[in-house]
């Protein structure tokens, strides 16, 4: 009989936890029904489309610093357009382009002087407008370190700060 009571109590607790609870919108992000940011990285080389019902953000991987250090080169632009198109299904979804990633080169050279930083920032704005993005994620791994086999400088940390301004 004790086991029956315990199982009944457990069943009641489980059922109560499944009740539809009102979601809080305290992230400060307009249109976000969740109190959390639920982000997925979607790759340029992938073929699947993420289920957006549980997501608040998608980071598209990847864009790279252009060869001339003055802009962005995007992997698989048609796929990026398709991912941005998911906002039609869920208008509150935010889509960002992640620029960089492991082994991404040219950040150090681009951030080293004001003219290339300014040109890069202007191109970020152009890319946001062209694709209807909600932002750019700078994924420089790692300023001041050649860990990923990329070029680096002792001034990278300071230059990264200047780039973010």
Predicted regions located by residue number:
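Mobile, glycine-rich extracellular loop/lid and propeptide segments
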Residues: 136-143
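Sec-dependent signal peptide recognition
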Residues: 2-12
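C-terminal motif of bacterial Sec signal peptides marking the signal peptidase cleavage site
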Residues: 15-17
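Glycan-recognition patch characteristic of GH18 chitinases/ENGases
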Residues: 26-129, 144-146, 152-164
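Bacterial signal peptide processing site
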Residues: 19-21
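Parallel beta-helix/beta-solenoid
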Residues: 129-135
